[in-house]
């Protein structure tokens, strides 16, 4: 059963509940490493929680009268980048972003080659001009500096549902639902299976 956000005190080795966010289905959580915890819910938008005060300091919720707000309260993924921009991945509503947390959102697009509207966004990595976006319908690579946009779907991918993406040592590690993990090389735009061990004959993680 959904429990909302649960806090674990390392020193006391005990669990406790945080304040109510109006929705106990938590889809993503991260922090700035200092004071603020960023929380995405599947039903009540985005919340910024003060770790010290245990209070919500800011929230983004869908409002039909606000054309510059987030377009859905069903949030699948959330990122606050090092420039203070808030990136919000929705269920079947694309990817929103807000410059410098000013509360004004717009759908991410790189016209005319890519538009995230109507995509169900599950994961993404933003590295300035280079972005990798995971959805329920495959993987998208966008390089705004070179003008390169490429999509990957089955059978090139082991699964079209991309749950998580991580950049490490020049490559993107792609976690799929039911298809194990793959590795994307941004230089060659090639995908390979992530294999256990150091030899190419090792079994793929499942």
Positions of predicted regions on the chain:
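Carboxylate-rich, polar loop motifs that coordinate divalent cations or form catalytic acidic clusters
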Residues: 1-206
């Amino acid at each position: 059963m959904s429990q909302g956000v649960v806090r674990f005190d390392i020193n006391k080795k005990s669990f406790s509940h945080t304040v109510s966010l109006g929705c106990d289905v938590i889809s993503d959580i991260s922090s700035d490493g200092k004071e603020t915890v960023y929380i995405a819910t599947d039903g009540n938008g985005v919340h910024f929680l003060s770790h010290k005060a245990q209070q919500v300091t800011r929230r983004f919720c869908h409002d039909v009268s606000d054309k510059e707000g987030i377009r859905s309260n069903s949030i699948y993924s959330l990122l606050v980048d090092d420039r203070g921009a808030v990136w919000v991945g929705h269920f079947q509503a694309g990817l929103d972003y807000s410059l410098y947390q000013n509360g004004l959102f717009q759908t991410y697009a790189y016209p005319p080659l890519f538009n995230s509207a109507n995509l169900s966004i599950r994961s993404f990595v933003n590295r300035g001009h280079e972005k990798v976006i995971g959805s329920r319908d495959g993987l998208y690579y966008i390089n705004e500096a070179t003008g390169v946009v490429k999509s990957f779907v089955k059978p090139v991918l082991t699964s079209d549902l991309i749950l998580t993406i991580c950049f490490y040592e020049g490559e993107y590690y792609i976690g799929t639902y039911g298809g194990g993990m793959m590795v994307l090389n941004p230089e060659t735009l090639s995908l390979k299976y992530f294999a256990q061990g150091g030899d190419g004959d090792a079994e793929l993680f499942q």
